[in-house]
Amino acid sequence: SVPEYRNEPEYRMFDRIIRGCMEKEKEARYQSADELQETLQELQNQLKEQAAESRIVVFAGAAAGIGTTHAALGMSHFLTRNGCPALYQEAYDTSAVRTLAKNMGIKTDRTGVYRIGCGSIRPYYGEAVKLPYLYFPVIIKDVGVIRPEEKLPEADFYVLVCGGKWWEIDRTVNAAKILKSRGNVILLFNHMEKKARLKLPKVLSDIHYFFLPFFSNPFREDKAANTCYRDLWNDGTGETRWKRKKLSQRLRRSDAE
C-alpha cells in the first residue's frame, strides 16, 4: 500500500521537483537554476508554515441558544479583518454551518472551507474525514454547549459564552468550573449590557469576564463588538496593547464583497 505521507501536499510537490529535474526531454526539465530555486523556496515556505503552531481558542456555551456560534464567528472575522487570519471551525456534530452556507448559496473550496466575506469557515466533518492541511495563525474552535462527559480540545485559552441573569448563573458556574480545570478561561456574557449589575460567586472571583454587545451580523464590522473582541484577545493572549496589522488588498476586497 502507498504510505499515507505520500498523499501530503508537500510530498507531492517534492516529488514533482525531483521528476522535473530528471525528465529525459530537455523542454520538460527546469529551464534555469533560478526557476528550480524559486520552486524549492516555495516548498520551504510551505514546510515552515506547517512547523508553525496555530494559536487555538475554544468557544463553548453554558447553554443552548446563548449565542456561542455567533460570538465565535464574530471573533474569527474580527481577527481576520485586522490582519490576523483566523479559521472558524465547527468542533462538534452539527449542521449549522452547512445550513447557513446553503441559505447563502455558497459551496466549499477544495480544502473543505466556506469563504464568506474575508472569513474562512470549516464545517464539522468528523474524525474519519481526511482534509488538506491548512495553516492559520489562529483557529477558533466552536464546541457548542459544554457537557461534563465530552472531551474538550486543547487550547491556548477558553471562552465561555454565558448569561449572567439569576436563572442562568448556576449553568454559568458549572460550565466555568469545567473549563477552569482545563486551562485559562474567560467569561463572555452575551445578551447583557455592561452597565448591568453582575455579582459573581466567589468560585469565579478570579476569572476575567467581558460583555459582548448586541450586533446582528457576525460577518459585518461593529465598533462596539470590536472593542470587546480586542480586549478579550489581549486578555487571553497576555498582550497589553492591540496593534492592528495592515490588511492585504485581497482581504480588503473580500470584506467589501
Predicted regions and their residues:
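Walker A (P-loop) phosphate-binding motif
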Residues: 50-82
